[in-house]
Amino acid sequence: DCFICKSEGFEAQTQIVVSLNGTAIIATLNIVHSNILQACEASLSESAWERLGAKIGDEISLSHLDPVLSLAYVRAKIYGKALTSYQFDSIIQDVVAGKYSNIQLSSFITACGHNHLSTQEIVHLTQAMIKTGEQLHWNHPIVVDKHSVGGIPGNRTTPIVVAIVAAAGLIIPKTSSRAITSPAGTADTIETMTSVSFTAKQIQSIVAREGGCMAWGGALGLSPADDILIRVERVLDLDPEGQMIASVLSKKAAIGATHVLIDIPVGPTAKIRSDFEFLKLQDYFTVVGRELGLHVYTLKTDGSQPLGRGIGPSLEAKDILAVLRCENDAPIDLKNKALSLAAIMLEFGEKAPLGRGLSLATQLLNDGTALKKFMRICEAQGGFKEPSSAALTCDILAM
């Protein structure tokens, strides 16, 4: 309620430029009406404080943000216009620069949703997202990766697959996301057993040591625009098809993968609910991947019911360990799917002849080699810990 804010037309949720000693950031303005701040005083969030290197009593300057010209392209998309590569570059650069408010981000996400992006637009969006982030390079002709479109509870195959594939000698720098529309993302589950937040340099060190990793992609800056968009998508409970493809493939290209397996569960309550939707998504992934220089393989899997027994990070982690430890009561559906995915990757990664991938994957799991590799990767990532159990439990017996 400062008179300066009023005279300048600053309102709540306005995007403004905050400057201190030659450093400037874009911040969202919140206005308080209590006496916690005096006239001509402002407080900063912890992240803004750190980025500016501010100290108590410093004098900051506030100014209006220049007009965000790329918003004109978002408005064009809302009205059904096709966007060019340059226009997507402009939008994504402004998103990463913090020039978009949450409302404006929501409008962009919505404008691109419900099949509003052509294949070429998805290519442009993906390339724009890659340009704004860091890219890793590996001195190997084949670098494999996988992604599950998700949409079904459980389905936590990634740690098992990474362990098997890395144990076979392939390079698999696996990054995963946190939950968007489910109780747990792969990164959330792995975090109950080991650390997942690393810099790009640390990832390179871990992979050089063990051939694979299991990290949270959001800490790497591989596709910073995607991390910003996912934060808003989570609130909206949306995962638009075009942006999902751009999200997945931008991070696969940025991590340095050459061969990527896309697991697409199809079922009545999954994200993909019909063969028609599967074939359309398969075509999108293949065509966009080819434009990026990626060998993309898609696999239709059963999405009619949950996979594994546990739902939530800790319980899903217990399922993973049961499979890796070859326990008698390990969930057979999770085990079989992980083996089938690993088998395909071993074959296109040229570690097994066509049709022999499953036998090699099964051998590596059953003889304990995969478990040893999993533990070694965890140690390289800061050490392994058993996933904890909840303080309170309740047995619910089947009738």
Put a short name on every predicted segment.
Residues 159-171, 251-256, 291-292, 348:
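Alpha-helix C-terminal capping segments
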Residues 66-153, 373-381:
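Acidic, glycine/proline-rich low-complexity segments that act as flexible tails and inter-domain linkers
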Residues 80-85, 95, 239, 258-399:
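Well-ordered secondary-structure scaffolds
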Residues 208-259:
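Phosphate/diphosphate-binding glycine-rich loops and adjacent basic-rich segments that engage nucleotide
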